[in-house]
Curated annotation (Swiss-Prot):
The modification ADP-ribosylcysteine is found at residue 172. The gene is Glud1. This is Glutamate dehydrogenase 1, mitochondrial. It comes from Rattus norvegicus (Rat). The modification N6-malonyllysine is found at residues 457, 503, 527. The lineage of its organism: Eukaryota, Metazoa, Chordata, Craniata, Vertebrata. The active site is at residue 183. Subject to allosteric regulation. Activated by ADP. Inhibited by GTP and ATP. ADP can occupy the NADH binding site and activate the enzyme. Inhibited by SIRT4. Inhibited by HADH. Signal peptide: none annotated. Its EC number is 1.4.1.3. Induction: By water maze training in the hippocampus and in other regions of the brain including the laterodorsal nucleus of the thalamus and the cingulate cortex.
Length: 558
């Protein structure tokens, strides 16, 4: 059974009655039993959640195995949705056969299908030779191509790429992007290499992936991740298109996150951070959730802290700042800064570009202690995995944790946040903006035309004809004795009169995707009485969608 594979431990079988009246009321909010009606939350009550956790994932509570951690979260979702999957099966099997089918497919979904481990030599600029290690994990091919970033870090490991690949599968499913999950890592510190050496490493890694069948527009499509960006993606695209893909007209679709000149798309660089903003916006504007947290809806009076001032942290900060929230703290690996009056993201970005660090920023002071425990409304961990653990979770002061990074919260910390009535907007939803816009870029590369190019002039002419038609109708009705009756477009309409640009289409598509997925998560949380356990609701949605693909496609050669 799939739950035994994850060694699920039911942490508590105690009912609400054993916990006292306050806990009983709050337990009703989170739904102790499937099918139990949830009570209206009473002010001041702290919900207490008890869910299925993976024993394997929590055996090292402050530093759990990352892949087992993801498997544990999967098990929680699977345990809740199993009965519905059995009920929805439209086959002529009996109840036991249907349940066996469901459990069998869930066992298929859970493991990582392929892991490629590579070692290859490069010659450094000083003439010395070095062997570089790299990995590419493909979690699922239920949809192809597989999709996932490439990171450069000395912390890269098989466990990490497997965990991140599995998260990508569920992330794509949550936001309805038709990809399987994958992830790659090269075990280097890019700061220790020249640009020429990094190009050698990137191009050689691309060739090794190509030789093993781990890259291609319809096979496996990498993207930027930690310490990689447009430059590295351009090298990958050029290497693939110049070698194994030289006969493939779609060769540049082998990777996303490219520069515009290489087939990239407007809005990709900021996509993950913009997705974080939209995700927070969708939940913070939902009055029912804010009433549980004791907060007012909207961003206007909210403060936030960002851990990690890279691509995700910077753009999350920019958009939240633009829409009225105040950034009071920013943390990086070399230290943190604090200003209760607010930190301007553009000024901080310029300072870091000039000095290489946020420390010393003149409009903020150094923050002593962990920035994760700073006083704020919204905490955005946008650095690396396993930052919020059993040790520091009790001291977190934020009421909303928005997971900009992948896997920043351990299972034990997640349990503590539920018990403390803290909302966690989960990673597999919140940071899906990057893969969503990567999907748009991939489609652009396959179509060989930018969004909006075919309709710009037609839409502009149509809009002017519409305005002229209105003007002529008014003049026929009221006459011209007082002069013409000009119909002047508003400033907002004037901006859109030529139709949507590529950036407009990308931003609109991303906003719609994040809003629709948020509504799906909210409905699932309500349906299963999950309360603030949005992570489990997101996993339930992902599991249902992936299960449907496997079930309807059939399992070959069984």
């Amino acid at each position: 059974m799939y739950r035994r594979l994850g060694e699920v431990l039911l942490l508590s079988r105690a009912g609400p009655a054993a916990l006292g009246s306050a806990a009983a009321d709050s337990a009703a909010l989170l739904g102790w039993a499937r099918g139990q009606p949830s009570a209206v939350p009473q002010p001041g009550l702290t919900p207490v959640a008890r869910r299925h956790y993976s024993e394997a994932a929590t055996d090292r509570e402050d530093d759990p195995n990352f892949f087992k951690m993801v498997e544990g979260f999967f098990d929680r979702g699977a345990s809740i949705v199993e009965d519905k999957l059995v009920e929805d099966l439209k086959t002529r099997e009996n109840e036991e056969q249907k349940r066996n089918r469901v459990r069998g497919i869930l066992r298929i979904i859970k493991p990582c299908n392929h892991v490629l481990s590579l070692s290859f030599p490069i010659r450094r600029d000083d003439g010395s030779w070095e062997v570089i290690e790299g990995y590419r994990a493909q979690h699922s091919q239920h949809r192809t191509p597989c999709k996932g970033g490439i990171r450069y870090s000395t912390d890269v490991s098989v466990d990490e790429v497997k965990a991140l690949a599995s998260l990508m599968t569920y992330k794509c499913a949550v936001v309805d992007v038709p990809f399987g999950g994958a992830k790659a890592g090269v075990k280097i510190n890019p700061k220790n290499y020249t640009d020429n050496e990094l190009e050698k490493i990137t191009r050689r890694f691309t060739m090794e992936l190509a030789k093993k069948g781990f890259i291609g527009p319809g096979i496996d499509v990498p993207a930027p991740d930690m310490s990689t960006g447009e430059r590295e993606m351009s090298w990958i695209a050029d290497t693939y298109a110049s070698t194994i893909g030289h006969y493939d007209i779609n060769a540049h679709a082998c990777v996303t996150g490219k520069p515009i000149s290489q087939g990239g798309i407007h809005g990709r660089i900021s996509a993950t951070g913009r997705g974080v903003f939209h995700g927070i916006e969708n939940f913070i504007n939902e009055a029912s959730y804010m009433s549980i947290l004791g907060m007012t809806p909207g961003l206007g009076d909210k403060t936030f802290v960002v851990q990690g001032f890279g691509n995700v942290g910077l753009h999350s900060m920019r958009y939240l700042h633009r829409f009225g929230a105040k950034c009071v703290g920013v943390g990086e690996s070399d230290g943190s800064i604090w200003n209760p009056d607010g930190i301007d993201p553009k000024e901080l970005e310029d300072f870091k570009l000039q000095h290489g660090s946020i420390l010393g920023f003149p409009k903020a002071k150094v923050y002593e202690g962990s920035i994760l425990e700073a006083d704020c409304d919204i905490l955005i961990p946008a650095a690396s995995e396993k930052q919020l653990t059993k040790s520091n979770a009790p001291r977190v002061k934020a009421k909303i944790i928005a997971e900009g990074a992948n896997g920043p919260t351990t299972p034990e910390a997640d349990k503590i946040f539920l018990e403390r009535n803290i909302m966690v907007i989960p990673d597999l939803y919140l940071n899906a903006g990057g893969v969503t816009v990567s999907y748009f870029e991939w489609l652009k590369n396959l179509n060989h035309v930018s969004y909006g190019r075919l309709t710009f002039k037609y839409e502009r002419d149509s809009n002017y004809h519409l305005l002229m038609s209105v003007q002529e109708s008014l003049e026929r009705k009221f006459g011209k004795h007082g002069g013409t009756i000009p119909v002047v477009p508003t400033a907002e309409f004037q901006d859109r009169i030529s139709g949507a640009s590529e950036k407009d289409i990308v931003h609109s598509g991303l906003a719609y995707t994040m809003e629709r997925s948020a509504r799906q998560i909210m409905r699932t949380a309500m349906k299963y009485n999950l309360g603030l356990d949005l992570r489990t609701a997101a996993y339930v949605n992902a599991i249902e969608k992936v299960f449907k693909v496997y079930n309807e496609a059939g399992v070959t050669f069984t």
